[in-house]
UniProtKB/Swiss-Prot annotation:
<feature type="compositionally biased region" description="Basic and acidic residues">
    <location>
        <begin position="83"/>
        <end position="101"/>
    </location>
</feature>
<dbReference type="GO" id="GO:0046872">
    <property type="term" value="F:metal ion binding"/>
</dbReference>
<dbReference type="GO" id="GO:0039525">
    <property type="term" value="P:symbiont-mediated perturbation of host chromatin organization"/>
</dbReference>
<dbReference type="GO" id="GO:0019904">
    <property type="term" value="F:protein domain specific binding"/>
</dbReference>
<dbReference type="GO" id="GO:0042805">
    <property type="term" value="F:actinin binding"/>
</dbReference>
<dbReference type="GO" id="GO:0044196">
    <property type="term" value="C:host cell nucleolus"/>
</dbReference>
<keyword id="KW-0010">Activator</keyword>
<feature type="binding site">
    <location>
        <position position="27"/>
    </location>
    <ligand>
        <name>Zn(2+) 2</name>
    </ligand>
</feature>
<dbReference type="GO" id="GO:0006351">
    <property type="term" value="P:DNA-templated transcription"/>
</dbReference>
<feature type="region of interest" description="Transactivation">
    <location>
        <begin position="1"/>
        <end position="48"/>
    </location>
</feature>
<feature type="compositionally biased region" description="Basic residues">
    <location>
        <begin position="48"/>
        <end position="58"/>
    </location>
</feature>
<feature type="region of interest" description="Core">
    <location>
        <begin position="38"/>
        <end position="48"/>
    </location>
</feature>
<keyword id="KW-1017">Isopeptide bond</keyword>
<comment type="similarity">
    <text>Belongs to the lentiviruses Tat family.</text>
</comment>
<dbReference type="GO" id="GO:0032968">
    <property type="term" value="P:positive regulation of transcription elongation by RNA polymerase II"/>
</dbReference>
<keyword id="KW-1035">Host cytoplasm</keyword>
<feature type="binding site">
    <location>
        <position position="37"/>
    </location>
    <ligand>
        <name>Zn(2+) 1</name>
    </ligand>
</feature>
Length: 101
């Protein structure tokens, strides 16, 4: 075995680096490729800065869509007490006219 330079960090010793380069693949083989791959891929630990997600800007199409929605006639208000009473009466009449077996 060759003597190792004591000034080198243990992870920079010859033979400590894998022969193949690290990839972006997340398969089991690539997750256990080296210690760096294991911490980043398998454990999900990343010490880098988190990227900010950009907000999606509203396009003109979506503004037109909003305008068309406001032009549509609105349905009955929820608090209107006069609306649903008539159909109930019809159902009651049908139940009275149809005798059970």
């Amino acid at each position: 075995m060759e003597p190792v330079d004591p000034r080198l960090e243990p992870w920079k010793h010859p033979g400590s680096q894998p022969k193949t380069a690290c990839t972006n693949c997340y398969c089991k083989k690539c997750c256990f490729h080296c210690q760096v791959c294991f911490t980043k891929k398998a454990l999900g630990i990343s010490y880098g800065r988190k990227k900010r997600r950009q907000r999606r800007r509203a396009h003109q199409d979506s503004q037109n869509h909003q305008a068309s929605l406001s032009k549509q006639p609105s349905s009955q208000t929820r608090g209107d007490p006069t609306g649903p009473k008539e159909p109930k009466k019809e159902v009651e009449r049908e139940a009275e006219t149809d005798p059970l077996d």
